[in-house]
């Protein structure tokens, strides 16, 4: 990431350089998803979902990744979904289904801004692709809250974070040590929580990534075998033609 200049004794105007957090790519054929996806889902549900939506992910996407079908179905049924109209032309609420998408915490953008002092919490479905640096940026943002430097006055409804463009953000520090109680007993440090939710959001941005890698591996394998066969067939067919003498009488 390109180094950016900051004026003396001032915060970065476009955001500081994030410390690096790398997601290990899955080699083809892909390995089973790590348990951190499930832990990241827990962090999202208990910490992030009250303000941020995940509108492009359905409950069925979780099946076989970090939950089994019964667990995902139970999570969906725990939510009430507005549906309709019914035979009488009225909307109604029903328990969620696997085909339903994660619900938004707010009915519209105006309600979201009103509840957050004018700031609009972005949907997190594609946040890893929508921000330069992806996991690096999100991890640095989540763990980078600190007191403003000397000479900079604090603000009432904003918080200092050098990794956010402009250095002031309307979201308070969302994760703290012990913020969740992990199901698998992993110590819930702020760094661990940030890492897990980054892994989950990276998966959410491309839930079909492993399938695409596997398909690419199969296609490349098939093309390699086909290329070898065509090379052998060409040698076999043209071997007699290349060595044949044409005599004119």
Named regions from a protein language model:
Residues 140-171, 187-191:
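Hydrophobic alpha-helical transmembrane segments and adjacent short intramembrane/lumenal linkers
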Residues 205-222:
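Juxtamembrane/start-of-transmembrane alpha-helix segments at the extracytoplasmic/lumenal side
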Residues 20-42, 53-64, 72, 209:
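Electrostatic cytochrome c docking/interface patches
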Residues 171, 175-206, 210:
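Extended, hydrophilic extramembrane loops/domains of integral membrane proteins
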Residues 44-55, 197, 201:
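The canonical Cys-X-X-Cys-His
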Residues 1-21:
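N-terminal mitochondrial targeting presequence
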Residues 212-215, 227-249:
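Juxtamembrane interface at the cytosolic side of transmembrane helices
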Residues 53-134, 156-184:
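Gly/Gly-Pro-rich "capping" loops immediately C-terminal to redox-active cysteine motifs
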